[in-house]
UniProtKB/Swiss-Prot annotation:
This is Adenylate dimethylallyltransferase. Gene3D superfamilies: Crystal structure of tRNA isopentenylpyrophosphate transferase (bh2366) domain, P-loop containing nucleotide triphosphate hydrolases. Pfam families: IPT (PF01745). Its EC number is 2.5.1.27.
Length: 243
């Protein structure tokens, strides 16, 4: 079985690359993302729209209400192994995402030692200014009012009505920044979807900078697979941590 692994920091184009390969191969994409397992925060977690998937298949490791909490890394890894094992009759799978904890669980597991042919592509952070430009564009898209999906701020305003969801939201990039922004400006969370243009721009910039901090931590803490063209078998269990 061929496993095509695509990993890298947020806003690096992983999903677009996975969709392209899925179109070319017909293989499903398994999302290596624990936050995307909560459909109630589809926009803020970066889940692609059905139209963006362009008829390709995308598999999430769970589907749960946010109040149940974010799926822990060990559970996500067990579900990933189940998905891969269950689909071994297929020619290949695409594994795409940027969960530091899940990728490191994979690095430590003997499951990935044998029985697979690996193709690995790691996307890099690159220049910080270029990253911030991409991140601002992405956040602006998340703030856009659409008929087919609530905006990030609408998701936050709705979920804030559930006290059990609040500490979880305060621990997720984007939502955490918006909550702090509301407190700084003495705004109710319910007011965030209707802030004026100036504050809109300010919040977009703040979230983009939070994404940059997260991307830097991903670059630092990701395991390291030999990539295609390395001239040696690709085996995740031999990974070394980037210090």
């Amino acid at each position: 079985m061929i496993l095509h692994l695509i990993y890298g920091p947020t806003c690096s184009g992983k999903t677009d690359m996975a969709i392209q390969i899925a179109q070319e191969t017909g293989w499903p994409v398994v999302a290596l993302d624990r936050v995307q397992c909560c459909p109630q925060i589809a926009t803020g977690s970066g889940r692609p729209l059905e139209s963006e998937l362009q008829s390709t298949r995308r598999i999430y490791l769970d589907s749960r209400p946010l109040t149940e909490g974010i799926l822990d890394a060990e559970s996500a890894h067990r579900r990933l192994i189940f998905e891969v094992d269950w689909r071994k009759s297929e020619d290949g799978l695409i594994l795409e995402g940027g969960s530091i904890s899940l990728l490191n669980c994979m690095a430590k597991s003997p499951f990935w030692r044998s029985g697979f042919q690996w193709h690995v592509k790691r996307l890099r952070l690159g220049d910080s200014d270029a990253f911030l430009t991409r991140a601002k564009q992405r956040v602006a898209e998340m703030f856009a009012i659409r008929e087919d999906r609530p905006s990030l701020l609408e998701e936050l305003a709705e979920l804030w009505n559930y006290p059990a969801a609040r500490p979880i939201l305060e621990d997720i990039d984007g939502y955490r920044c918006a909550i702090r922004f509301a407190r700084k400006h003495d705004l109710a969370i319910s007011q965030l979807p209707n802030i004026d243009a100036g504050r809109h721009v300010e919040l977009i910039e703040a979230i983009a900078n939070e994404y940059l901090e997260h991307a830097l931590s991903q670059e630092r803490d990701f395991p390291q697979w030999p990539e295609d063209g390395a001239g040696q078998p690709v085996c995740p269990v031999t990974l070394t941590r980037i210090r």
